Amino acid sequence: MADGYFFSFDKLSYVQGKRPAGCILCMVRDRSPDVVDLSVHRDGLFIAAVNLYPYNPGHLMVFPCRHLEDVREYTAEEERHLCALQRWLFGLLDKACSPHGYNVGYNMGAAAGASIEHLHLHMIPRYPRETGIADLIAGRRVLVEDPQETARRLRAIAAQAPFSISST
């Protein structure tokens, strides 16, 4: 392995271009049969989905239904909605994964590490014995849950307490 670089071998084929033509998150939004749909929440403004290449079980990607590429393009309504949705998603993840913390953030642009242009927010559950995100990216930890199973568990919890902007 080259010094100073991290490899995520599961994601290698995706990064090398072995992916469907077009925006993969727009394809998820449109329920294309060409992509895996791991969504756990959908509404008129946002979709929350389990990351197909998670750093940890419960790693979510939250993205606007509109194809945006920069956080500064959000409307005021989208910003308010996203804040309430994040709060609700933290509750789902707390119940499903019992993390001790979270990494939350955006990678905007290829130089920042974004492999998908469509704006998306990462919500990554974290645990006490981890030494950091670098260990996850370097592949030194084993994920103990398939993303499909994570999506199933989160959907079941979401069905018990559906998202409502007024209930957050």
Predicted regions and their residues:
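HIT superfamily nucleotide-processing domains
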Residues: 1-168
